[in-house]
Amino acid sequence: NNFNVWSIIMSVVSANNNALSAITALPASVSGGGLNLIKTQTISSDTATVSFIHGTSDVVFDSTYKEYVFKYINCHPASDDQKLVFQATTNGSDFNTTVTNTYFYAQHTEADNSNPFAYGADDDQAQGTAFQRLNESTGADADQSISGYLCMFEPSSTTFVKHYLSRSSTIFDQASHVYGAGYFNTTSAITGIQFKFGGASIGSGVIKLYGIS
């Protein structure tokens, strides 16, 4: 409520009985937060899939954190015209969890002859079990790749569906920015996420998993 918010503000201001710039520590009532790196997977040669499964290879993906973030950085496909996709598992091996989502994008071509902002009707799912697309197509030229992030909220919940949101930036002779969001329609705990390109291996790239505290 407003009283609690004001109390926190005043506790910060009076923490050192000085200017805000002089504060070196927060009161106990004010919690911090940050990205806690859990796992980095670096791809340097053609790789079909990249998986993050709880309890495997030092991966934590359980009730330790309420929110997890995957960052995919300069993921480059082994062949042209590819979309990075992902799916979730509840048993550590089958990546086919039912998902409903939304997907829209903005684009601007290098030739400056097209700049659509549109809903991706071919890129969403309604109670589907396929791998979900994260980006508009990226090419296999040496300088082309996809970067972005995927947020998963409380994957360990056995009460609620599992919400996610994503944002991706892609180059394929045009700038593409994709916004995605949806939910995995299961009350079982999600124990892992897998990434791959829809029709090619991942030639190179980095995918990182963080827990949010």
Describe each PLM feature range.
Residues 11-213:
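Surface-exposed molecular-recognition determinants
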Residues 1-9:
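Short, Lys/Arg-enriched N-terminal segments with co-localized hydrophobic residues
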